[in-house]
Amino acid sequence: MAKFETDVSLDELMTSLTSVDIEAIAPLALEQSAPIVEKKLVQLSEPHKRTGAMVKSIKAQKASKSGDGYSIFVGASGVDRKTGIRNMEKMAYLEYGVREHNQPATPVIVPAVRSTHDDVCDSMQETFNKYLENNGL
């Protein structure tokens, strides 16, 4: 059986945690960690560029709230002016391949998410810790 000691009672800890303003911290943590994924997506997409339109369009949007909580989109946006094809559509073709054109899948999204997972979690934890320090919790 595990045993631990603490200087804070469970009631004090719960009171401190319930005073955390999730509405303020969640979007901030997401927006501060998004550039990590953005940089990796650009790095992995760079070798596959033809015109550079898709790679240049990779950006992080602002955090948004839905019924499930906060989320943030990092990826290609907009439309290629020359071809009229949406940049996210190009990224999907790259990720999954196109059978009709014998284009093999060369994933960039899944490897970017997997390789940045730990750094993103560390960044979000750091943001949370700074929030706690600044608010004396």
Locate the predicted segments by residue.
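Short, Lys/Arg-rich flexible segments
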Residues: 1-73, 92-137
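A short, structured beta-strand/loop element
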Residues: 77, 81-96
